[in-house]
Design a protein with these regions (language model features):
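Residues lining hydrophobic/aromatic ligand-binding pockets adjacent to catalytic sites
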Residues: 1-275
Length: 275
């Protein structure tokens, strides 16, 4: 079974938990005079993954996709180091206002597991920077067996990551969530370096729904259960939570859908989150 999935999602309590108290403190520090930025997208633009999404005869999928949504979780950068030219090609196909959220290459996160990765990280960031103003936020997704014993590697990676490039991190191992002292150490690190703590809403790992923001930005990865009723209710729940966070000071929302097996336009309209 793939990470975060459940054999019986119909038995999962999908209600959002209450916020960590520190989330309100983080949001209240934000400048409420800033305009709202809401970015909604998927984890792929391939027509084989977004069934029923593209009109018949669509040839340039990214060009069409980027005019329906304003962001994308870019997984292609996870599987191989992106070249400068590839980044420029992607960038130039998307309109102004679109944002790419590229995942850190697996050679850094999964193969070397953040050990001795400075040269690779520099190469990655040099190439990714060619997204220019269409770069949303780079995100580091660590393997679910990356544990607290490797915390020093995470510290080093964050301390040496270019400050000009916004960074988010998704932790997966249960140790990061079931030990308060460990969790607090991570959150302090993230807050110190302005690293966004990704919240994952997935059926099989409700502990990833920690509701603990470390920057005044909400980066949500929503894993669909592909049940129209429960997914609709979950999305409504998120919209209500965002309303609370906006009142507290939230001005940046990144909401990325993943594992949506059959696209239904009326079901996940991007405008629903913007409203």
């Amino acid at each position: 079974m793939k990470f975060g999935q459940s054999e019986n999602p119909q038995h999962i309590d999908f209600r959002l938990p209450t916020d960590d108290p520190h989330t309100a403190e983080i949001l209240k520090q934000n400048d409420t005079g800033k305009p709202m930025n809401v970015y909604v997208g998927c984890d792929k633009w391939n027509k084989n993954d977004l069934k029923n999404f593209y009109p018949r005869g669509t040839k340039d999928e990214l060009s069409y996709y980027s005019r329906q949504f304003n962001s994308i979780e870019l997984n292609a950068t996870f599987y191989s180091m992106p070249s400068r030219q590839q980044v420029i090609t992607w960038r130039d196909k998307a309109p102004n206002g679109f944002r790419f959220f590229p995942k850190v290459t697996q050679s850094i996160s999964h193969m070397r597991r953040l050990n001795d990765v400075q040269m690779l990280t520099d190469e990655y960031c040099d190439n990714i920077s060619n997204f220019e103003d269409k770069l949303g936020m780079v995100f580091l997704q660590l393997h679910d067996n990356f544990k607290y014993k490797n915390f020093d590697r995470l510290v080093s990676f964050i301390e040496n990551f270019p400050k000009a490039i916004p960074l988010a991190v998704e932790l997966r191992n249960t140790e990061w969530f079931n030990n308060t002292a460990v969790s607090n150490e991570v959150y302090e690190l993230f807050e110190k370096h302005q690293v966004t703590n990704i919240v994952v809403d997935t059926a099989g790992r409700r502990d990833l729904l920690h509701m603990r923001l470390t920057t005044p930005k909400a980066f949500i990865r929503y894993v669909g259960a592909n049940n129209p009723q429960s997914d609709r209710e979950r999305l409504d729940d998120w919209i209500n939570r965002f309303k609370i966070w906006v009142e507290l000071g939230l001005r940046d929302i990144y909401f990325l859908f993943t594992k949506i097996s059959n696209w239904n336009r009326p079901f996940f309209p991007p405008i629903s989150l913007k409203e």
